[in-house]
């Protein structure tokens, strides 16, 4: 009687899944205008979550805490007390 020893090997490699490979889209937060820069009314000055920087003179705060210029003028980033910062817009004399 003839005995055959047949062994079959996997023709496909075992594929494992990974739990990585995804990331959230960046929110593009931070300063949009620099200190001393001229801006027009309605320009976004600073995008933020919460009040990292407070609105100063002639600056409004949007529903998502975005700071924007209310008038045309020059941007100034200033200190507000010991530990707070604010951004203001001052009109330019022409």
Curated annotation (Swiss-Prot):
Family per similarity comment: Belongs to the bacterial ribosomal protein bL27 family.
Matches recorded under NCBIfam families: L27
Post-translation changes: The N-terminus is cleaved by ribosomal processing cysteine protease Prp.
Pro-sequence residue ranges: 1-9
UniProt-recorded name of the protein: Large ribosomal subunit protein bL27
The species this protein was found in: Staphylococcus haemolyticus (strain JCSC1435)
GO molecular function, one term: structural constituent of ribosome
Gene behind this protein: rpmA
One of the record's GO cellular component terms: cytosolic large ribosomal subunit
